[in-house]
Amino acid sequence: MENFRKVRSEEAPAGDGDEGGSPNSGPFADLAPGAVHMRVKEGSKIRNLLAFATASMAQPATRAIVFSGCGRATTKTVTCAEILKRRLAGLHQVTRLRYRSVREVWQSLPPGPTPGQTPSDPAASLSVLKNVPSLAILLSKDALDPRQLGYQPPNLSPGPSSPPTVSTSKRSLGESAAEEGTAKRSQPEPEAENEDRTA
């Protein structure tokens, strides 16, 4: 493939209607009409996605949001959903994983100038059909059916960014041990007092 370059990549038409273009044909067919769909791409900026998602979920009319991405964008999709769950507590989650067919069109690179070749020779093209993983994450303010596959209830325990409820952090233990050490050092030792008196 070193003599080819990718011209375009497009989603292949689906035969079963599972991945068509309508908004309700995705993995969450029973979504409310006001749900926001965030399509995460490989080149998407996380801060831009989260700014829009946070502003959308702040509106009372928006009850659900779906993050979806395929191929190399799946990790970014998970990152966006996890950050939004940390920012907005109490979100119910359903995760769906599937495969999508993507058609890549490659075109041959023009070879170096050779004698006898005319510049008007058409370049050869190659079409490749690939199955890539696709991930869709639904986050909802409303309770979802806990029996469906991929369901995660809201996280009720404090997250890593929340302060601990009991002050047993390493820092507080270290400080108290250091304070005890300085308190012991500030008291004069009995042997030192005896030496001062004899002198």
From Swiss-Prot:
Subcellular location: Nucleus, Nucleolus
InterPro entries with a match to the protein in the record: Alba-like_dom_sf, Alba-like_NAB, DNA/RNA-bd_Alba-like
Gene Ontology MF annotations: ribonuclease P activity; ribonuclease P RNA binding
GO cellular component terms, A-Z: centriolar satellite; multimeric ribonuclease P complex; nucleolus; nucleoplasm; ribonuclease MRP complex
Compositional bias ranges of the Basic and acidic residues kind: 1-11
Biological process terms in GO annotation: rRNA processing; tRNA 5'-leader removal
Keyword Phosphoprotein recorded: yes
Region (Disordered): 1-31, 146-199
Keywords in alphabetical order: Nucleus, Phosphoprotein, RNA-binding, rRNA processing, tRNA processing
Residue ranges, compositional bias (Acidic residues): 190-199
Keyword RNA-binding appears in the UniProt entry: yes
Modified residues (Phosphoserine): S172
Main location: nucleus
Known function: Component of ribonuclease P, a ribonucleoprotein complex that generates mature tRNA molecules by cleaving their 5'-ends. Also a component of the MRP ribonuclease complex, which cleaves pre-rRNA sequences.
Record text on subunit structure and interactions: Component of nuclear RNase P and RNase MRP ribonucleoproteins. RNase P consists of a catalytic RNA moiety and 10 different protein chains; POP1, POP4, POP5, POP7, RPP14, RPP21, RPP25, RPP30, RPP38 and RPP40. Within the RNase P complex, POP1, POP7 and RPP25 form the 'finger' subcomplex, POP5, RPP14, RPP40 and homodimeric RPP30 form the 'palm' subcomplex, and RPP21, POP4 and RPP38 form the 'wrist' subcomplex. All subunits of the RNase P complex interact with the catalytic RNA. Several subunits of RNase P are also part of the RNase MRP complex.
Family, similarity comment: Belongs to the histone-like Alba family.
PANTHER family assigned: RIBONUCLEASE P PROTEIN SUBUNIT P25, RIBONUCLEASE P SUBUNIT P25
Protein name: Ribonuclease P protein subunit p25
Gene expressing this chain: Rpp25
